[in-house]
Every structure is written in C-alpha cells, then in structure tokens.
Amino acid sequence: MPSVRTWNILLSAYAIQGDISRAKHCWRRMKKSEIRPDIVSYNTLLNCCVKSFRIRKKRSRNSGNIEEDVEFIFKELMHDQDVLANHITYLTMINFWINKKKTKRAEQFLLKVIQEHKKSNNGVMKISDSKILFPLRSLFHKVMTGWLITKKPENAEQLLLKMTELSDDGFDGLQPNTETYNILINCWAKSNKWESGECAEAILRGMEGLVSAGKEKVITNRDSYNFVLEAWSNSGGDISLIRIEKLIREMVSLENPGVLPDSDSYELWLKTIAASNGRVDKIQKGKEVIMMMKTHNFCPNGDIRRKILLLSDS
C-alpha cells in the first residue's frame, strides 16, 4: 500500500503543473485508501490551488470554484485532529487571497488565526505548546504588501498598529521593525496620493523617535529615506522638490554609509526637478545635484548622467 509520502509526491507533481482536478482526484483516492494526510499533503493541495489560479489568470481563463476549494481544504485541515496547520499553510492562504487582489480577505484570515489561537488557549497568547500556531511577523508583512499593491496605505497602517497592540500584549515576535515601517512608507510612496510625501516623512520621523526611546529594531536605513523621497516625488507640488533636497542633504550629513544617497535617491531628485514648473532653474538644480554627489564621492551611472544632460537642454 502506498505511504503518505508516496501520495504527497503525486500531489506535488500535480501542484507543480497547477492541475487542481488531478490533485483533487489523487486526494480522494488517498483518503479512500485510509491513508491519513499530513500537513505536507494539505499544504501541497492548497499550493496547487494557488498555482492553478495563477495559470488560469495568465491565460485569461475563469478561475472556477478555486476559492471554494481553498476554503474547503483549509476547513478540513482545521477539523483534522491529527494535523496542525503551520506557517507554510498560513502563507499559502495569504498568497492566494493577495493574488486574487483580495487583500481584505487575506487580512481577515490572518486576524482569524489570531482569534482562534487565543480561543484554543483560553484567551491567552502562547508562543509554543499551542493547538494553533501564532502567525509570524513576516505574514503581517505579506498582508501589508498586499495593501501596497492595492494602494491602500491607511489599511497597512492599521495593520501595523495591530502588530504593536499584539506586541504590547506580550507577543514580542510581532513587534514592528525597520522592514515593517519601510513597507508602510513604501505603501504611501506607491499610493500616489497628494498627501503621501507628508505622511511618509511623518513615519520616518516617528521611527527616529522610537529609536531615541530605545527601540533599536526600527532604525532608519537608506530604503526608509528612498521611499520617503519617492513619496514626495509622487506627491507633486512645489514643496516636493524642497523636501527632497532637504532629505538628501540630511542623508549625506548623517555620514552613515548605510544611509548615503544612491542611484535611486539621485534619480528621484532628478525626476522631480524635471517635473518642476518653469520657475525652477533646472540647469542650476542639475549643478546642485552634481555638487551633492561630489560631497560623498558618488559616481553616477549612465542613466543619471543622461538625465542631468537633459536638464541642460530643457
């Protein structure tokens, strides 16, 4: 009689192809043979659903009842007393909803897991020895990235606040770190909202305040600054160029190799200069960019050189 490992190999082969119909047929045969599925079996079948959706989407085909399949498989897993859902399970579920541009469903799933975790432990959050694993910080980051894709920074901000709340309740593994805040700043940058520059810079200053209060896990880095630069650049308006120039001067003045402006920083500065109205002396601004590069021996690439030359021709 085939072992659970053999069945899992078959399921994996169908999952790679995204062949959900054959995977489900294999699943039914497996259960009829009285072989108990393990967590690998469940995760593989769920992953097959995700792969199937991606393939159908790429080929512009109807996704059919894949949502129903995913929910049924997960529900069956949660009722299986012999199998414990793990973080791969959670990630697969979250990926599925984000791929379908249903970030709200991904967030609801994540918060439901937290609720069920507390319920299984009589209202107490436990790091170990729990019937339902508590989600990792990276899963929250994944959902926040979903909000980035759908250009809803306010929702990402609420999720970060939820992480802080859970961390304050004793689950230190969810304390927001630099990556968490950078994702949030990037959410504002990609939102193209008129207020995105102001909001992004406020978050940057908030990170600095947390570091001053002893929260070293949220120290700002070059990405933090570059996302703020992008947010200001996408905000538009006369103040955007002023804020970008000030931030780049700040990056240089910190004398921190991990914060010094890079190609992305200068390209955003040049992009904003090029988009500025006629009252800006673009040739003079181009010279200021070159002078700033010289202060920290930055060697511009070909693209940056061309953009500086284009300012001279404008």
Outline where the language-model segments fall:
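Repeat-mediated protein-protein interaction surfaces in helical alpha-solenoids
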Residues: A23, E116-S128, S167
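Tandem alpha-helical RNA-recognition repeat domains
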Residues: N8-D19, R28-K32, N43-S63, K75-H79, ...
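Pentatricopeptide repeat
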Residues: S3-N8, S12, A23, D38-N43, ...
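Inter-helix linker motif
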Residues: E34, Q81-D82, H117, I132, ...
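Alpha-helical solenoid repeat scaffolds, predominantly canonical TPR units
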Residues: C26, I66-D69, I73, F109, ...
